[in-house]
């Protein structure tokens, strides 16, 4: 048995008889009691090292990315060059559907960074649509009657047609309501060298809306912060006036992309808020939902 079968499907070996045990003992004595050397894997490594580069790349591409970076590149100089090179990571990207199989091979130099960024790509904001009330949000300011989570479309509102999974929104009141989230990029899996050298694009998006029966104000502020929370880059929408509109009341997207922001970014602070313009008791202020922060490959 070569050990490649399913352990549960392999039968238990029968116990040797006393006569067979005696014969095995005699055979060991005849061999001088020498033990058979165990394969330490050097033979397999030597065999792999003899493979043509295209075949070796395909073998390496089957391994987990962390194992490639942490172990395989330490085996020898040739493997280090392959792991650090673009072809291996382009192949992994193609195998995992991150880029088309027949896509161009020379448009991007840093396929390793592209791979890791693509695998981590997700909305870094928690609870962007109010499914968990205000869970995940900090520095919450409850002006007027405070924030309230409402079901779409809400009174004098419209459905959110841009994403069918969005079912709720946050409604502000007759004085400024604000809330924020602070994203720890290193805790989310983005290491210092990647942030400082590659400086991947950071894309911020938010959606806001008013009511058809009341005008309102909306504002978005996003800051890129250092380890000590110094502001390294900032975007501010200013106060956006949303007029009452009996014919529309639709949702508007606001977005900003941070690039070339320099080394040292460790945190992202996302803050938005709103209020109404008529000072009516209740929740006639700006509505927000589907907020997002993405680190793009």
Curated annotation (Swiss-Prot):
Subcellular location: Cytoplasm; Microsome membrane
Segments forming domain F-box: 45-92
Membrane topology classification: Peripheral membrane protein
Gene Ontology biological process: ERAD pathway; glycoprotein catabolic process; protein ubiquitination; SCF-dependent proteasomal ubiquitin-dependent protein catabolic process
Coiled-coil regions, chain positions: none
UniProt keyword terms in alphabetical order: Cytoplasm, Endoplasmic reticulum, Lectin, Membrane, Microsome, Ubl conjugation pathway
Subunit and interaction comment: Component of the SCF(FBXO2) complex consisting of CUL1, RBX1, SKP1 and FBXO2. Predominantly detected as heterodimer with SKP1; the heterodimer with SKP1 is not part of the SCF(FBXO2) complex.
UniProt-recorded name of the protein: F-box only protein 2
């Amino acid at each position: 048995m070569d050990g490649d079968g399913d352990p549960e499907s392999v039968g238990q070996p029968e116990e040797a008889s006393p006569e067979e045990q005696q014969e095995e003992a005699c055979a060991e004595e005849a061999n001088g009691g020498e033990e058979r050397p165990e394969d330490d894997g050097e033979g397999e490594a030597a065999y792999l090292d003899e493979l043509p580069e295209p075949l070796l790349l395909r073998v390496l591409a089957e391994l987990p990315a962390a194992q490639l970076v942490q172990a395989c590149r330490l085996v020898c100089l040739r493997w280090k060059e392959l792991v650090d090179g673009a072809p291996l990571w382009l192949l992994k990207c193609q195998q995992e559907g991150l880029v088309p199989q027949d896509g161009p091979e020379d448009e991007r130099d840093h396929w390793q960074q592209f791979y890791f960024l693509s695998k981590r790509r997700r909305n870094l904001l928690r609870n962007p649509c109010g499914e968990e009330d205000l869970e995940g949000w900090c520095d919450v300011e409850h002006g007027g009657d405070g924030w309230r989570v409402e079901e779409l479309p809400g009174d004098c509102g419209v459905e959110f047609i841009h994403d069918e999974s969005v079912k709720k929104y946050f409604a502000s009141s007759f004085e400024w309501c604000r809330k924020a989230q602070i994203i720890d990029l290193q805790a989310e899996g983005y290491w210092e060298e990647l942030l400082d050298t590659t400086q991947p694009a950071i894309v911020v998006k938010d959606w806001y809306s008013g009511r058809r029966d009341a005008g309102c104000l909306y504002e978005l502020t996003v800051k890129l912060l250092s380890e000590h929370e110094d502001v390294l880059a900032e975007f501010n929408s200013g106060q956006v006036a949303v007029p009452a509109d009996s014919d529309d009341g639709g949702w508007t997207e606001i977005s900003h992309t941070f690039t070339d922001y320099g080394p040292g970014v460790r945190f992202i602070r996302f803050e938005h808020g709103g209020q109404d313009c008529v000072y009516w008791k209740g929740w006639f202020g700006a509505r927000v939902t589907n907020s997002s922060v993405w680190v793009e490959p």
